[in-house]
Amino acid sequence: MLAIDLMEEMAWDDFLSKVSDNSYRLNNNGQVMEGRFQRKPNGKNTFTPDDGSTPLFVAERNSMSALSGDRVKVSVMARRQNHIKEAQVIEVLEHAKDTFVGKLRVEKELAFLVTPGSLYTSDIIIPKKKLKGGKTGDKAVVKITQWPDSDHKNIMGEVVDVLGPTGDNDVEMNTILAQYGLPYKYPKNVEEAADKITGEITPEDEAEREDFRQTFTCTIDPHDAKDFDDALSIKQLGKGLWEVGVHIADVSHYVKEGSIIDREAVKRATSIYLVDRTIPMLPERLCNFICSLRPDEDKLAFSVVFNLNDDAEVKDFRIVHTIIRSNRRYCYEEVQELLEQNGVVDGTGQPAPAPGPKGYKGENADLLIQLDRLAKKLREQRFKNGAVKFDREELRFDIDEKGHPTRCYFKRSKDANKLIEEFMLLANRTVAESVGKVKKGKTAKTLPYRIHDNPDPQKLETLREFVVKFGYKMKTQGTKGATARALNKLMDACEGKPEGNVIQLVALRAMMKAKYSIHNIGHFGLAFDYYTHFTSPIRRYPDTMVHRLITRYQQGGRSANKDHYEELCEHCSDMEQVAANAERDSIKYKMVEFMGDHLGEEFDAHISGIQSFGIYCEIDENHCEGMVPMRDLDDDYYDFDERNYCLVGRRRHNRYQLGDPIRIKVARVNLEKKQLDFTIISNNGDKTKKKTEKEDGAKDGEKPKGSKSSKGKRKR
């Protein structure tokens, strides 16, 4: 056998990799693996095997044309002494995507797409005739027409959409959407299909539905909302007994399964909420008009109607298709003001006191106060049953007419928000129980559940060790209920304290992510054995699925195909995460843009994160978060103590600990990368600083003898 034949046979058996004609490279004992490749800006790329084993390092020179997210085949390289295990990409099996977003640079002969971060070792080359009118500085979406291979070293593409000039607010928000493969405009044919829907309520609709048009009904939403998913109705049935209706827009009546509108809704799976806009799941005609439960208009709804006693115990319920007519559209602020002017103190959990001789103040006050009273009973019972208290505040911006942020603040959930929340939770739980809770020996029919697994035990133990540093104790062993009670006790103890936000953040990291599945395991955070999403079909596709299945089962239909619905659940969970990432990026962009107006200014802050490459700090005044890069900590060589969430100086022993108060200056902003850099003015949390400086004989501003500012620094 010729040597070349032998090498070809060895290549077939994965002992060798063919590099080019008559050229081969030796694999490590023929060990070949498949998995995902992740490109890093610092060149320290990683390969994560499909089998879940330890990720491997892939040097830039061994990465071929692989991009982040690509499925690749690698050969595991022989391990060198004192080196981490490495791999070499030998084949790109599947590219994660074929369109990319960046900034155009047009030159004499060719044009280039410059992508944020480190997409590839070189920019994407675009023939000038494929620019679609794009100019230097424009943001554009480019489709790859040629991947690098043995014959072509460059990555080539063509412009499919020019978004517009860099820096324009609409362009930057659309850029974020495009980077995640999310839609930034609605297909014309889908909008045309929506325009043909009349929204007319027919005599057949009236005959088949329960009529709630004579019962007081209202919506309570954010002041700028247009898509009113849900409404509440209330009337007294007798002494100590109330009928409360949770009425949900009947989207599935208008959006038929498999229709062109439905196919687009499946693809999107969720509405997307950026800082200054909503990208709806459904066409505007449906989400803001036909389906939206607007005041003084007859609307079709799918309702869960409860009979509740004064302790909010469910005495009876029914799930029915209805016709409603909202009497009043409230915003949260209006209802909150009404509650407070009638004696409710927000956050205490106490309902309004008994009315005076003239009754409660405000329009429909008696009914709204009764809804609040019942909601507080529901909330109290939920926490008794083991629900976890995580009241995270939302970062908000005031935006001017040009899209520029003028104010940054946190918005806290108040009693009016919690009123709506509790009835939505009750409806979702009840719908899930109506299908999933069956007699022993029977099999429940298919339904998408919203599931939330128990916390990661190792992360809970890390949390326990972390909070000890602040003087808190926490038990991590025991039942689900015991874990929830321990978490709630910790949240109550640190509420309002300087370290409260950081502790809550570390606690959240111990939690698993909620997701959709037909395989029910319950919901740890809410302490529900059965839970689904039924109450927001205008903005979440799983709710539309649930509406259709409930209708099907009410009509005597058989259980739906499990595999089909599990696939849809996985898709919706994935799209929910993608949408959340886009929302987070829009917040980062506006945060950096806002702080760009404060370059050189000093602020009080606290350390909100510690990594090997730097310290994250959150400004106390406006909650904007930036980073102090490790390269700027030039007074010592710092070691990263991951277990204790801190950096410790080797010579001076200065310590930067998660949660420490700190004084920072705004040093740099980079809108393109959404990066905000700070420098440290003083570390108020370091109790060792003065002592160690004296021991080292170093004055303020001086480096310890023999130290170098660049030594050991890691760039971001």
Predicted regions located by residue number:
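Charge-lined substrate channels and their catalytic hotspots, especially those that engage the 3′ end
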Residues: M1-G245, S252-E297, R329, Q336-E337, ...
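Electropositive polyanion-binding surfaces
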Residues: V141, Q146-P148, P165, T175, ...
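Short, low-complexity cationic-aromatic patches
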Residues: L104-K108, I610, Y656-L658
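Intrinsically disordered, low-complexity linker and terminal regions at domain boundaries
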Residues: D70, A78, A87, E91, ...
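Acidic/polar residues at beta-strand termini and the immediately following turn/coil
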Residues: P49, T115, N309, D400, ...
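Non-cytosolic beta-sheet module surface loops
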Residues: F37-R39, L104, I607-G609, R668-N670
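Internal insertion modules embedded within essential enzymes
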Residues: G102, H152, R668-I680
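Short beta-strand segments
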Residues: M33, T54-L56, K85, F100, ...
